[in-house]
């Protein structure tokens, strides 16, 4: 037994995180909010302070990589002031002595092997670890003091998250060949959950395109927001993306943007479906039901999280 709890229980808890992100698609946090939050809360509570390690390993694993990135994107483009707390640890429990070892055992238990992992550069790898560890600590809000200035914390943390997304965008465009070095070249004969270099590159390209489209949409939709913190966030996002998204790109957006964005989203979904046709079916994975998002104004601001999930007192 390598952990503080029995290995079987530890492996199951880590496997839940892998399966959650394997199934996660764009806007789950918005369109399927209730079931997503409920599942996520259970996973974070079970992982405790190993949450950042789980995120790191799921990011590196090919079948869950896109889910982690789209989860982070959903947080980065959320107008709810409490959603950033989902990157923070839920509680102070440290359930595993060696979370990395438990993750590897979970991968073996679900049919994943060495050909299922990305190999980012050392610089990006260090940045990723630092980012996740930092957010695990700083995204926790003290109920006694933090709730009174959560809007300011929201802007600061969202800026940090967007800086990571920007770095991901630039590095994945520059160094993607090395990221895919360990993956199989052929599409046929892959192990369950594995992705070939071609399929994984196509998926990363889709994520990069989604990053640009959603960033432009967020900036254009909220630059004249009635809420000054949202306007400040737009200003910071524009600064981060200044060398990629020009003022002209934003200024040229018109009232038809929503229709155009919907068309792009449909096209992205179609391309993802085409990519997924090559993947092996994932039996027993979590499925999400679509829920009507009928949150109140306060719920919209604070992120509809329970007390122990969003904040730490």
Curated annotation (Swiss-Prot):
GO cellular component: host cell cytoplasm; viral outer capsid
Sorted UniProt keywords: Capsid protein, Host cytoplasm, Outer capsid protein, Virion
Subcellular location: Virion; Host cytoplasm
Main location: virion
Pfam families given in the database record: Phyto_Pns9_10
InterPro entries xref list: Phyto_Pns9_10 (IPR008776)
Protein family according to the UniProt entry: Belongs to the phytoreovirus minor outer capsid protein P9 family.
General function of this protein: Minor outer capsid protein.
Protein name, entry field: Minor outer capsid protein P9
């Amino acid at each position: 037994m390598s952990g503080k709890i029995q290995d079987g229980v530890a492996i199951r808890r880590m496997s839940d995180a892998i399966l959650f992100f394997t199934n996660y698609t764009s806007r789950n946090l918005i369109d399927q909010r209730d079931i997503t939050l409920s599942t996520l809360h259970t996973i974070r509570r079970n992982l405790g302070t190993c949450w950042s390690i789980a995120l790191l390993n799921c990011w590196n694993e090919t079948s869950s990589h896109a889910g982690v990135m789209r989860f982070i994107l959903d947080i980065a483009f959320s107008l709810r002031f409490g959603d950033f707390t989902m990157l923070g640890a839920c509680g102070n429990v440290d359930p595993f002595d060696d979370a990395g070892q438990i993750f590897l055992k979970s991968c073996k238990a679900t049919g994943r092997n060495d050909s299922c992992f990305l190999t980012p550069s050392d610089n990006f790898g260090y940045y990723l670890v630092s980012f996740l560890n930092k957010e695990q600590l700083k995204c926790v809000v003290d109920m006694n003091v933090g709730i009174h200035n959560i809007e300011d914390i929201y802007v600061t943390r969202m800026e940090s998250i967007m800086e990571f997304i920007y770095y991901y965008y630039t590095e994945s465009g520059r160094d993607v060949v090395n990221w895919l070095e360990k993956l199989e070249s052929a599409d046929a004969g892959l192990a369950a959950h594995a992705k070939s270099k071609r399929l994984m590159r196509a998926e990363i390209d889709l994520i990069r395109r989604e990053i640009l489209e959603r960033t432009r949409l967020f900036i254009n939709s909220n630059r004249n927001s009635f809420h000054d913190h949202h306007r400040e966030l737009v200003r910071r996002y524009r600064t981060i993306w200044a060398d990629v998204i020009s003022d002209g790109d934003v200024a040229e957006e018109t009232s038809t943007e929503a229709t155009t964005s919907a068309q792009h989203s449909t096209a992205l979904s179609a391309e993802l479906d085409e990519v997924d046709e090559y993947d092996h079916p994932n039996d027993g994975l979590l499925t999400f039901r679509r829920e009507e998002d009928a949150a109140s104004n306060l719920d919209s601001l604070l992120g509809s999280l329970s007390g122990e999930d969003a904040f730490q007192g």
